């Protein structure tokens, strides 16, 4: 029985990283195990905590009553089944011992290492554009969240056990922390890096003040401060290189790599396209009207070449094609509009692309293809939904969020209409779907179990919860099967260890 639970949890961990189907199998096994397991522990548990944990799923059930699209409501209910099954499972099974916990943790970290290695190999050694394509198993944002969780847990473990831990154990943990942080940088995961800056550093410093000598704490502060300084300096340097003109002021144009695009005069633009067309035919044997296909978008090679010339600081003339290197020609042939994108510095590439997204939005109002600008557009249009018909109290219902969001986008003639995108803010999603009542239920669902079980004293749980809550500001963390299963498993695992009604207490910090 003990090993069956280890198998189920390890299977769920593998599914989180590698496969939605495996996650579904793990969830089915959890439901079956709950039916078959001895219910003595379940009967003795704190029912108020369990009911609070089931409140969010109950919200989806209740929301079906005022949902217009019942088919979508049933899909949402099915997707959110982990909020029902996972807590019941963890509250019923026997508590895993230390050996089982080690086996589960070992497998979970091994899965992260394997998946991250595959992603980096695909990203750097194969023709893969970005981490979204390099990580074929699921959402790269959710994977970054998993990596940040593992990084924080390893750091907290070192700080809480530094007196008892062997040098080998500390060395392994530090090595894994360095590897996971390196993965986030090499994969240019801005979300993961920001989560580390906002959550990892403050929580770790707080734990260090409680657990470690002042000398080691001071050293940790120095390391963290140096990391923040380096990151801030890099972003500032990139911004200076990108936005500060290198050849005079840039009036009525957009700037890239310090050079100005003059895009207002169509006569000049047509003349420059003609010059680019000559070079495309002569040097790359590409027809002037050829298009480069990137996913769902198509771009004219003349525009790609024109932008590349500007980024190099070259005048857009046929004669200047001779000044391009073979690698420059290959970049244009491969649809790369900026030489920085082929520099091999993933963090710099991601930041420069973000800069271009803002410039394109400022100059042309271009939204599609820009992740950050898209989110702002979705937040603006999504917030309008609750203003109609007094929906601020109960929301639109379990199954109507996607439909109502698309309707709002169409009414404002947004470029994101019919894109199928969601809000990308979990709090706003809950408010639109279930209104103010739903937000209050969600707060109860998050706060009450942690308060009742005193897990706010547990550094592991505080870090996990802070990480998830911060990620919800820019992502629908709980609107994706990976995110839902991850939250349910971690939250239920921690809470289920403090649910005994007698005076015996199980502290995760001492067992992990």
What are the roles of these predicted feature ranges?
Residues 300-312, 316-321, 346-355, 359-434:
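Long extracytoplasmic/lumenal interhelical loops at the membrane interface
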Residues 433-466:
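Hydrophobic transmembrane alpha-helices and their immediate junctions
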Residues 12, 58-61, 65, 99-129, ...:
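Alpha-helical transmembrane segments of multi-pass inner-membrane proteins
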Residues 1-38, 51, 56-67, 79:
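N-terminal signal-anchor transmembrane segment
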Residues 49-56, 70-94, 103-107, 112-116, ...:
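Aromatic-anchored transmembrane helix interface
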Residues 2-6, 42-56, 100-108, 168-173, ...:
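Membrane-interfacial loop-to-transmembrane alpha-helix junctions, especially the N-terminal start
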